[in-house]
């Protein structure tokens, strides 16, 4: 029990020991300077820089730079349901070509999603007078597409993390334990969910769908103040340093071409 408590304390410290204020001053100054550059050089040049950064930052920083999120079953099923009943393309598919975001889920999500398609979808179809067989076919197809772009992880070997996850959320819903276990064991930035059970714990950040969309929009627009909410200060400074170095490399390249 003592060992279990120490593990929990370590995780609490690790998740909360983020010296964001030290980085924020630098971030604010950077944005101020960046706005001046945008006014001087124009939007076309800024778009060029944005494309360049998105293409090269992942290469420079590797996997450290990616926003890693665990996604729960209800989020995926709601996407499937909207596609089948309303014809809306799942927003989660927008993540497929984004180099800065990775989605994860435990193996359990496959069975849970299948169960919801078999048992919950027919009830929804009946209310909306939608053909059940056609709806199931469409649901299975889009669910497979979504799952194929999520990293499904078998968490059977994460015993210590499972114990911590049980202590955090097991009293609310044991089915949520694999999702919390995965978020802890992979050192992710949180879980995308609408499930209120997850909010009982304070260790893992819980993301709303809208928050994730904002991050994606910020990335697409080339903003450099995006989403470093749960990243440690050293990595934050490493990111900024790499951005500055990249800018200097671009400027140097332009100067060489004009000489």
UniProtKB/Swiss-Prot annotation:
One GO term describing the cellular component: membrane
Entry membrane topology: Single-pass membrane protein
Domain of life: Archaea
UniProt keyword annotation of Ligase present: no
The name this protein goes by in its record: Uncharacterized protein MJECL38
Pfam families tied to this protein: PIN_2
Keyword Membrane: yes
Keyword annotations from UniProtKB, A to Z: Membrane, Plasmid, Transmembrane, Transmembrane helix
Chief localisation class: membrane
Bilayer-crossing regions: 235-255
Cited InterPro entries: PIN-like_dom_sf, PIN_dom
Annotated compartments: Membrane
């Amino acid at each position: 029990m003592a060992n279990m408590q120490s593990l929990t304390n370590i995780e609490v410290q690790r998740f909360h020991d983020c010296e964001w204020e030290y980085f924020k001053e630098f971030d604010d100054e950077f944005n101020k300077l960046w706005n001046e550059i945008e006014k001087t050089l124009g939007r076309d040049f800024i778009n060029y820089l944005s494309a360049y950064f998105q293409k090269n930052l992942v290469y420079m920083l590797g996997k450290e730079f990616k926003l890693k999120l665990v996604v729960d079953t209800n989020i995926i099923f709601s996407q499937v349901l909207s596609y089948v009943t309303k014809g809306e393309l799942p927003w989660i598919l927008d993540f497929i070509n984004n180099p800065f975001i990775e989605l994860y889920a435990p193996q359990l999500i496959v069975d849970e999603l299948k169960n919801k398609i078999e048992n919950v979808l027919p009830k929804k179809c009946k209310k909306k007078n939608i053909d059940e067989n056609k709806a199931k076919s469409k649901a299975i197809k889009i669910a497979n597409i979504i799952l194929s772009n999520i990293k499904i992880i078998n968490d059977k070997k994460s015993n210590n993390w499972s114990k911590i996850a049980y202590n955090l959320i097991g009293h609310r819903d044991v089915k949520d334990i694999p999702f919390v276990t995965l978020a802890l064991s992979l050192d992710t930035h949180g879980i995308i969910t609408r499930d209120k059970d997850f909010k009982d714990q304070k260790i893992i950040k819980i993301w709303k769908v809208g928050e994730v969309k904002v991050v994606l929009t910020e990335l697409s627009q080339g903003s450099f103040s995006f989403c470093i909410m749960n990243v440690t200060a050293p990595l934050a400074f490493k990111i900024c340093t790499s951005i500055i170095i990249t800018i200097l490399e671009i400027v140097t390249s332009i100067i060489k071409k004009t000489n």
